[in-house]
Every structure is written in structure tokens, then in C-alpha cells.
């Protein structure tokens, strides 16, 4: 693979098209770039040297990781029932994905005041989401136990997608990523969240028997294969990205929810996804919230794309 630390240069016309598509994907309602550009100088919940800023800059990794996270979330009966009963995911999946993606990026890159305001609005909404799950248990979206699972699976998905398809991460980076996420998790209402890779694995071990095979999961995967998230010429790749997401889920959890290995990537497909992930990690786009956050803090556009001491510490072995 190419050195991921070297900025990718593509023809200007193509660069503009990619920027425009990313802007539409992240801001479907036409909201302004000032979400991340202003107020000038205001810090985010996390600093630009964080592992989170490194990982969240990659839109392909976020897409793959987001699918993996939602699969695990929907397999928990209370979370799955809440999402399917109280959101517009089935009717307007792309709009739902766009809002969720924007919220995740605001949490990481947005100015602290706006991020906290957005999170407060989300928590108020969660208070109103109550019902009976498919397994007969009552649920509320503000339940700290459910928020912990949603937060942990989101962190897991984004981290593992980046590690598998973009750039391998050292153990210290993985632990840092989980510990960095703690302040935002508390704001969302999660009282106890994994702060290390070991803690995440322990949570997964406890949850393994509580996840269920669900038609909701399979409906979600069918939607993700069809939703027009990519430009029309690239939409056939969504099947591969969905497979890539399933593949990062631990085998024990995957088997327990009925996904098995039938949806695994072929070796050539894995190489293709890795090449795409590498390219996305080296393409500096002015519409990327990561770049806009750097501008807000008076940092160069390519700050997150410059070499770091540990970038080449772990060679990839699956390509």
C-alpha cells in the first residue's frame, strides 16, 4: 500500500466532486460549514493530537465502523426495538445516517459549546423514547446501561474499522481512544464506559449471551446495501463495505446474532477496501469537518495528515 502519511493528489475536477458529495452527505439540510469553522479558536471536547481526531477524519472508516456498531446495537433487543420503533431509519435511512454521522463528528470536532448544546438536545430526546422491547422488557433510551452499550459499540466500530482497513493502531493508541471517549459518554448519560481495550473485551464477553438474532439486524443490512450513500458509480461497493463491517465484529458475537462467516470478504475484496481506506485517509478535503476544525484552531489543513511518530509502528499483514 502507499504510505498513508503522504497526501493524495487527484485531478482538481474530481477533488471538487468528492468535496461536494462529502458536504451533501454530512450536511443534508444545507447547514453551513460554520458548524465546525466557528467560533474561531474555540476548542473541541478533544484536542487535535487525540487518537479520536486521527480516526474520525476518515469518512470510509466511519461508514464501515458505523455499520458494525449499529449491527451490535440492534442485536440488543431493547436498543433494537427503540431504534426501529421510534426513529425514521426504515422510512428515510439516508437522512437518519446523515444526522447520526453529523452528531458523531460534532462530538469529536465541533466547538465545545455547540457540541455540548447538541448532546443536551439528544439526551432530552432520549428521555421521551420508552416502550416494550421484542423480548418483553420495558426500555427507555436514557437508561445508562443501554447508553453504555451504544457508546461502547460505536467506539469499537470506528476503532476496528480504522485498524482493519486504514492503518493498524498500536495497543496504547487503542486504549487512548477508549479513554478519550469518556467525557463525551458522560455528557450523553452513560455512567460506566470501557476506558481500555481490555475493558471493552470484558463488556463484550458479558453481553455475548444477551444479544439475539433479529430480523431487525437483517433488515438493516439490506437497507445499507441499497441506501444511496455513495455516488452512483460507486454504489455497488456498498455491498463490500457492509461485508467489511460485519467482518470486524468478533466471531463469537457474529455467530450469536446469526451472521457467521458467509458474509466475509474475499481476499481481493479486502485489499480493495483497504486501498479505498488508505486513499480516504490521505485525501485532504475542505468540506471534511476534521479539516474545518483544524482551520478553526488556526492549524494547517493537512495537520491530521502529517507524519506522526507511531504511524508506521505496526505494518499491515492482511494485504
Predicted features by range, described:
Residues 1-149, 153-319:
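Mature, function-bearing regions of proteins
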Amino acid at each position: 500500500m502507499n504510505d498513508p502519511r503522504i497526501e493524495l493528489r487527484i485531478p482538481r475536477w474530481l477533488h471538487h466532486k468528492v468535496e461536494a458529495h462529502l458536504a451533501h452527505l454530512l450536511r443534508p439540510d444545507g447547514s453551513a460549514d460554520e458548524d465546525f469553522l466557528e467560533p474561531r479558536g474555540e476548542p473541541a471536547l478533544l484536542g487535535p493530537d487525540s487518537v479520536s481526531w486521527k480516526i474520525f477524519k476518515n469518512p470510509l472508516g466511519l461508514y464501515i465502523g458505523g455499520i458494525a456498531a449499529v449491527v451490535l446495537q440492534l442485536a440488543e433487543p431493547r436498543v433494537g426495538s427503540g431504534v426501529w420503533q421510534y426513529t425514521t431509519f426504515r422510512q428515510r435511512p439516508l437522512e437518519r445516517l446523515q444526522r447520526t454521522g453529523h452528531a458523531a463528528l460534532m462530538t469529536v470536532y465541533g466547538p465545545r459549546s455547540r457540541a455540548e448544546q447538541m448532546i443536551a438536545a439528544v439526551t432530552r430526546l432520549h428521555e421521551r423514547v420508552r416502550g416494550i422491547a421484542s423480548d418483553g422488557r420495558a426500555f427507555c433510551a436514557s437508561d445508562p446501561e443501554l447508553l453504555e452499550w451504544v457508546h461502547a459499540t460505536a467506539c469499537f466500530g470506528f476503532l476496528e474499522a480504522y485498524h482493519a482497513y486504514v492503518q493498524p493502531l498500536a495497543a496504547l493508541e487503542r486504549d487512548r481512544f477508549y479513554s478519550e471517549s469518556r467525557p463525551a459518554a458522560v455528557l450523553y448519560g452513560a455512567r460506566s464506559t470501557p476506558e481500555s481495550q481490555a475493558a471493552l473485551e470484558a463488556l463484550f464477553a458479558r453481553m455475548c449471551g444477551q444479544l439475539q438474532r433479529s430480523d431487525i439486524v437483517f433488515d438493516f443490512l439490506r437497507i445499507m446495501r441499497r441506501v444511496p450513500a455513495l455516488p452512483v458509480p460507486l454504489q455497488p461497493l456498498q455491498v463490500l463495505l457492509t461485508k467489511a463491517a460485519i467482518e470486524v465484529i468478533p466471531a463469537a458475537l457474529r455467530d450469536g446474532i446469526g451472521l457467521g462467516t458467509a458474509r466475509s470478504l474475499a481476499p481481493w475484496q479486502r485489499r480493495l477496501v483497504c486501498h479505498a481506506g488508505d486513499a480516504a485517509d490521505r485525501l485532504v478535503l475542505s468540506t471534511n469537518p476534521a479539516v474545518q476544525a483544524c482551520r478553526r484552531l488556526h492549524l494547517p489543513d493537512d495537520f491530521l495528515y502529517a507524519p506522526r511518530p507511531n504511524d508506521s509502528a505496526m505494518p499491515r499483514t492482511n494485504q
